[in-house]
Amino acid sequence: MVRYVKFSRTANRGVHISAEARINERIRVPEVRLVGPNGEQVGIVRIEDARKLAFDADLDLVEVAPNAKPPVCKIMDYGKFKYEAAQKARESRKNQQQTVVKEQKLRPKIDDHDYETKKNNVIRFLEKGSKVKVTIMFRGREQARPELGYRLLERLANDVVDFGIVETRAKQDGRNMTMVLGPVRKGKK
């Protein structure tokens, strides 16, 4: 079996970049710009002296800016730092809104009552904060009359203008015509 491996000319260029910050003995430079445990600037010191200061304070020496010349290191409690970073990441994920896209399918020759039902579904989705993808499905001879689909989507957009705005205008995609509606963002009170 032959296995092909793709190499990229721009990837890494021989530099290994770790997702984790280097700490204590893993820092392999002769001197660093040191920041104290309270945020005060200590200055440029030899790495041995920086490690000794961190050891005396019963803290870790953490490389916070490895690309600087010389690299910037800070004396801190690395376990606490990692815990707080994980808490912030978890909090930011929790505050992110999941965008849900609902789909409502219609036919170009839809009856009035059916249209009202579909329109009410679209309004309900928009009120809940979901985006709605409205799809008009053409079949047979209906494909020769795309203007029916445009008119129907325009009518729907006008009917739900108080609840949603058109994010993607109507466009033909094979046998279907689609339009995306997004909920109206209410201003913060």
Curated annotation (Swiss-Prot):
Keywords: Cytoplasm, Initiation factor, Protein biosynthesis. GO terms for biological process: ribosome disassembly. It comes from the Bacteria. It is found in: Cytoplasm. InterPro entries: T_IF-3_C_sf, T_IF-3_N_sf, Translation_initiation_fac3_CS, Translation_initiation_fac_3, Translation_initiation_fac_3_C, Translation_initiation_fac_3_N. Its main location: cytoplasm. GO terms for cellular component: cytosol; membrane. It holds the Pfam family IF3_N. SUPFAM superfamilies: Translation initiation factor IF3, C-terminal domain, Translation initiation factor IF3, N-terminal domain. HAMAP family: IF_3. Belongs to the IF-3 family. Monomer. This is Translation initiation factor IF-3.
